[in-house]
Amino acid sequence: MKLNNIELSFDNFASEMAKLKNEKHFDYLVTIIGEDFGEEGLGCIYILENTQTNERCSVKTIAKKVDGSDVIPTVINLWKVADLLEREVFDFVGIKFLGHPDMRRLFLRTDFQGHPLRKDFDMSPEANQFPCTDEPEDDFTVEYSLSADGHLVETQKRRFDDDDYVVNIGPNHPSTHGVLRLQTVIDGETVKRIYPHLGYIHRGIEKMWEGMTYPQTLALTDRLNYLSAMMHRHALVGVIEEAMGIELSDRIRYIRTIMDELQRIDSHLLYLGCTAQDLGALTAFLYCMRDREHVLNVMEETTGGRLIQNYYRIGGLQADIDPNFVQNVKTLCKYLRPMIQEYLDVFGDNVITHNRLEGVGPMNLEDCINYAVTGPAGRASGWKNDTRKRHPYDMYDKVEWKEITLTGCDSMDRYYVHIQELYQSLDII
């Protein structure tokens, strides 16, 4: 995948970004990368995508020094996902985004000192005392702007009104699908606003990588998300191999593709099972967990691991596949097809399931793109965003399979997308 690289100055950054969004139709903000460029100063790289043509571009800009602070105009008015992305950059790099309505830390504690992804960050234990007290709480946020004479203005705002009914969810949610805390403002059963608190299991992997060789970094990719360990490592070894000009054999590419799809089945089965569990359907949950065990057993025979496999290497694999791998995968695929229909019979097509999922969590196509809701959730709103189709790698452009999209834009169709993608993964394998 090639990018068109653009560099913008501080003065024309806001207007040129608006042109990229409104005239060039780069409507999807993939990510914002905060960076310490050394003598150049602090800055950001924005990755943008045109969802109609799949064209991508990168935009680099250097922050301006104002009253000792590094500032860049916000793009939250163009892409709503910038709300969290800019807060992440502020948290780790320290760039303040002018006009952002909620410039608080996102991952680290509010009383954390410094910004750890800066090159001059002091890593010594003396400067990073482990806190033994509760994190300070406040209801205020900060917005930064420039005054008429060019000085930085800090404005404090309250997040909650006096009559807001605030309910805290987490940080230890009963379902523990991900450790986070949500401050919600509710009106009856309607959620009016949500303020997320992330980072409870943030381990500073980016900072650790700064002092590692490329082979040493691989062990940490599997731990980014144990439900997609293969894919995370695949992404890293893929860019390293491309940069080094390493050509892989078709055998390695086939094995990686099959392993990725086995991992996808593993992940989707857990999603389907936990959805059933959250609605009280324990039978459907146990069915999914039972079949997920079969998938993990097949991967474990070759990789030696069930969740953390450490299988892909730069330029190849840790080892060849197990002698029984091919036969076991064929047996697994034959077994799973009728089981998927069983999930629908027991849970997915149940009237109670439809009553609880239809119309819940509505998010239309425009909102999905604006908030960068990708994956099966975005495809359930009609967004054709599957990287395997849009930017194919390994053997995904060599096999026939369908990209599943639905238009219900609710939790029910998100469930159905996962179901249909199980069939597609079996077809790819």
Please describe what each predicted stretch is:
Residues 1-190, 267, 352-360, 367, ...:
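Terminal low-complexity/charged segments
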